[in-house]
Structures are given as C-alpha cells and as structure tokens.
C-alpha cells in the first residue's frame, strides 16, 4: 500500500508538471494568473491589458542569491531553485538607499499610481513585462532597463512597462543593482575589488540569456537601455569583456562612461573615509572589509548619510567631496579605464543610440544636490567658489574656473540679469558633463564602426510634484514619454500622446532592427562625420553639430589640461 501511495503521488506530481508545460507551450498565459517555468522554478504572474493587447507581468524575480552576510562586497551568485509556485505579482524591495531615493522615484514615476518603495539589502530582483504570444509566433526583441540615480538611488519598480511592451512589441526587463556603499565600495585590492553593482547588472543579463525565451523574448536580440547612472552603466558595459555577447544594441540616455566621475581613480581614499565613519578604521584592508560586513543595513545607511554623498558644498575643499561611489578599474569588469579602451576603438561595434536633454541641470539635480539657485550667487567670488566645488564633475582645473565663468556667466553678472544667469548656469553644467561626454562617446563608437544615432530631447515636460520655471527638458523628463505615461496616467492631451507614441516607436524600432527609423516617423539620420542628430520635440527635426561652439570651447579646455 505504501508503494502504491508513493506511485500515486509521483503520478500526480508528474501530471501537474506536464500540465504546466503544456499550458505554457499552448499560450495558456492568456489566463488572468499566468504560470511560467524558468530555469529556477515556476512563477505565477498577473495579466493586464493595454487596449486589446494582453501583457503578462512577472514581478520580483530573483536573479541572484541575496547579497547579504558573507555575500556583501562579493560578486552575485546564481539564485537557488525553489519548490512549488513562486508568487510574482508584488513589487520587490528596492536596493538599500537613502530616503531621497523615494523622492527621486516619485519624481520619475511613470505609473498611474505611485508605488511607495521599500528598501532592503536583499534586492537583486527584476520585473518582466511581456506581450502574450500566439502559438508558433516568433520571439520578440528584449529591452533591459538600467535605472539611474547617481549609483546611490534607483528602483525597477519606479517604472511601468506595459505601454512600451504592448505598443513596441518587445519584452521589457527592469533590473536592480546594489547601490552606494553596498554596490561600489572598493579598497582597490583583492579584499574588495568593487563594481558589485555592475556585476549585478551582468548577472541579470546572464539570467536574461538563460530564461527570457520562456517569456517570449529572443536572447539573440537584447537591447540595453538606461538613464543617468543607468546610461553610464550601459556605456561602460559596452567595453567590458564580461558583458560581451550578452546584448546586441545599446541606448544611453543622459550619461556615458566618458563622464570623468564614472570612474573613481583612488577608491582607497573613499574606503578609508567610510571605514572611519563606521568605526572600522584599520591598516589592514582585510580587517576593514570584515568589519564593514558586520554592520547592519541600518548602520550602512547611517554611514552613507554621514558621507554626505551628492551634496554640493562650496565651503569645503573639493578634494574632500565624495559625490558618489562609482565604478573602478578592477582588472575584471574593466581591464583598463573605459575611456582608454574607447580611444583605442576596443569596443564591439553594436548599434548605439544615445542623447541628452537640453536642460539637464534645471531642477531635478540641483534639488537632489541641495544647491540653492538664487541671486546671491550672482557675483564673481561666489560663482568661482561654486564652480570650483564642482571641479570633479565639470573636469576643470582651478585656473580654468574664471575662463569658464567668462564664457558663460560674466555678461549676465555684469547686467544683473538673474534669469539669464540661471539659464546660462544650467547650460554650463549640462554642457560640461552630459553633452560633452555624450558627444565624445558618439564619436568614439562612430569611429569604431558602430551605427550611431544621436538625439537632443527638448520637450518641457510637466511634473506631478513640481512646477519648473525653466522652459527646457530637465534630467529624466523623457522617461514619462518613453514609458507611455500620457496613456497610462490618462490625463494628457492628444499632442502629448502622439509625442509619447513617437518616442516609443523610435526606441522599439531600434530594439527590433538596430535602426530607429520606421513608417510615419520623421527621419533620423545616422551620426556620421557630418554629425547630424535628431531634436526630439512636438516638431521633431534634424539638427547638425550639437552645440558646436560650446563643445569646441570645452574640447580646447580639456586639451589644455596638463596630463
């Protein structure tokens, strides 16, 4: 009888497994609670509709073991398989970050209702949005989103992927990676090499290669896309040997690895500051790392706050300011500085779409960096102090500060024109950072043989939480249009929806073919020696040589710096 009972259980178990396999194979994901078999186990998601298009949504899928305990400051490890059916209908915790990450998420939120974030060290999860495929239908291109946030903040759950997945006919993956101290702490040696956040990203891309076909995605057609720090990450992975073969197109929105702040040249200096604030001072980096591993998540967050990351301070020696922890040349993710590799043309020539917004420093970044833009700044002494405090981000020497002020600000100061001064300062910081680095990256990839498409996003987007005075496109303003917020939030005018549809089509076309052009879209020329680019706005049009005179100024300034 015992043997008969065991046989009956075995038969029932086998029957359930076969049912699930058949259910998946026959497109049974049309059900309200779709089931799906991955390499690590069975997932139960949910189904939503965009018009008549059903989208399957799977949230909180683990792509690594939790990076806690001895796995803190260590490369991610593949997740363990699970028994039974794993619920994938609720948003996962976001990676540990300071409270301002919540504000950033509210500002960038693309969903109809804001999802309040929960922070945890156990955060290596991803969200997938996939159109339901008919039996026998071809696999869809995959787009993997890298959230931004200065390597200090960001969450996969800030973004809603249903609109882009449905209208672009793509499978969307939103990943998360460790941030701040937990993601980028490095002693510069084998005790803590660093780049943990980038290794998380690479682990997520490996998960995509192994599992995405089950969601209807094509592992041989993967496009990376990201914004700000996410865009820098995408740009960096394009020259990393660890990421080769894991993607086939790339998109960088407002950020590339050419930005000076992308690489931390002396990570041990920052590591010692962190250790000191944590009470982990020691001459041995091994002991230092072991001590930091013993801290609770709350203690790590407290140390992060005491480091005053991403906060401007014109009264402090710029050499003492640690804007954020960033990637390092570790000999693993990056054998050499990415800019050196790009200069040599050591990059796989995949199609690359990249661009900037025309007012990157309007409100979002100054607010997060606690910079008060006011008329007290309008004198030569104060502006010199402010510009010098930004020297790491602007990549200027102390001797070049008055040269930069003269180029952008002096006439506004002499005319006591506050509006002109403010707008020029916005241009100055945006030009020196995002615009210059993006153009340089476009040229490097073009010269290496990649098809390159450049844009400048110009549409002034309204925000649900702030009224911005400058009539330009702020850092992150393109995201609501890219992810279809005018449709999902349901309160936008027809022009906003048409513009959003245009952006989604460009990005999806690029994911499908490596070329953004398509039917009924304004033509987007390749970025060749003539340096044509697309100005994205309600009246989208072609431009030539983005900010040519200002870029010549910055190029000459950088070339005059001592090596």
Swiss-Prot record:
It comes from the Eukaryota. It is found in: Secreted. Glycans are attached at residues 283, 379, 395. CDD domains: Esterase_lipase (cd00312). It comes from Mus musculus (Mouse). One of its GO terms (cellular component) is extracellular region. InterPro entries: AB_hydrolase_fold, CarbesteraseB, Carboxylesterase_B_AS, Carboxylesterase_B_CS, Type-B_Carboxylest/Lipase. It is an enzyme of class 3 (hydrolase). Its EC number is 3.1.1.-. Belongs to the type-B carboxylesterase/lipase family. One of its GO terms (molecular function) is carboxylic ester hydrolase activity. This is Carboxylesterase 4A. The keyword GTP-binding does not apply. Probable carboxylesterase. The active site is at 228 (acyl-ester intermediate), 360 (charge relay system), 475 (charge relay system). Disulfide bonds join 95-123, 280-291. Keywords: Disulfide bond, Glycoprotein, Hydrolase, Secreted, Serine esterase, Signal. Residues 1-27 form the signal peptide.
């Amino acid at each position: 009888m015992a043997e008969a009972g065991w046989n009956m259980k075995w038969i029932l178990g086998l029957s359930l497994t076969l049912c699930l396999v058949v259910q998946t194979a026959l497109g049974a994901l049309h059900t309200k609670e779709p089931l799906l078999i991955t390499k690590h186990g069975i997932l139960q998601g949910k189904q939503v509709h965009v018009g008549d298009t059903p989208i399957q949504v799977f949230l909180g899928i683990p792509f690594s073991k939790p990076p806690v305990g001895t796995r803190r400051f260590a490369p991610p490890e593949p997740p363990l398989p699970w028994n039974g059916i794993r619920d994938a209908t609720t948003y996962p915790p976001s990676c540990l970050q300071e409270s301002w990450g919540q504000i950033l998420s509210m500002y960038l939120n693309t969903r109809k209702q804001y999802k309040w974030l929960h922070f945890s060290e156990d955060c290596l999860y991803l969200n997938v949005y996939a159109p339901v495929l008919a039996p026998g239908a071809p696999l869809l291109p995959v787009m993997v989103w890298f959230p931004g946030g200065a390597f200090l903040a960001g969450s996969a759950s800030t973004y809603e992927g249903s609109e882009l997945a449905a209208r672009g006919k793509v499978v969307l993956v939103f990943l998360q990676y460790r941030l701040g101290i937990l993601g980028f702490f490095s002693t510069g040696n084998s005790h803590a090499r660093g780049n943990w956040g980038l290794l998380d990203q690479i682990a997520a891309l490996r998960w995509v290669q192994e599992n995405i076909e089950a969601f209807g995605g094509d592992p041989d057609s993967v496009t990376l896309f990201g914004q700000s720090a996410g865009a820098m990450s995408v740009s960096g992975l394009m020259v990393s040997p660890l990421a080769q073969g894991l993607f086939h197109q790339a998109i960088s929105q407002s950020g590339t690895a050419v930005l000076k702040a992308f690489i931390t040249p002396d990570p041990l200096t920052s590591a010692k500051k962190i250790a000191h604030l944590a009470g982990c001072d020691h001459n041995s980096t091994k002991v230092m790392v072991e001590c930091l591993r013993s801290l609770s998540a709350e203690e790590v967050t407290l140390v992060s706050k005491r480091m005053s990351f991403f906060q401007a301070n014109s009264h402090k020696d710029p050499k003492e300011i640690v804007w954020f922890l960033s990637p390092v040349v570790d000999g693993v993710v990056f054998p050499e500085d990415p800019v050196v590799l790009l200069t040599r043309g050591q990059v796989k020539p995949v199609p690359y779409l990249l661009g900037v917004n025309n007012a990157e420093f309007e409100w979002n970044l100054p607010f997060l960096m606690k910079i008060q833009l006011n008329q007290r700044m309008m004198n030569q002494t104060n502006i010199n102090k402010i510009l010098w405090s930004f020297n790491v981000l602007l990549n200027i020497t102390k001797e070049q500060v008055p040269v930069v002020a003269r180029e952008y600000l002096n006439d506004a100061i002499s005319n006591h024109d506050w509006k002109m001064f403010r707008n020029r300062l916005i241009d100055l910081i945006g030009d020196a950072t995002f615009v210059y680095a993006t153009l340089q990256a476009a040229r490097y990839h073009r010269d290496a043989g990649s098809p390159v498409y450049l844009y400048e996003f110009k549409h002034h987007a309204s925000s649900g939480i702030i009224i911005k005075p400058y009539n330009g496109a702020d850092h992150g303003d393109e995201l609501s249009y890219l992810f279809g917020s005018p449709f999902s939030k349901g309160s936008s005018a027809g022009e906003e929806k048409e513009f959003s549809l245009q952006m989604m089509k460009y990005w999806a076309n690029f994911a499908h073919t490596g070329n953004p052009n398509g039917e009924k879209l304004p033509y987007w020329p390749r970025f060749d020696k003539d340096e044509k680019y697309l100005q994205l706005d309600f009246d989208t049009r072609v431009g030539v040589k983005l900010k040519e005179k200002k870029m010549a100024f910055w190029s000459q300034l950088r070339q005059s710096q001592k090596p």
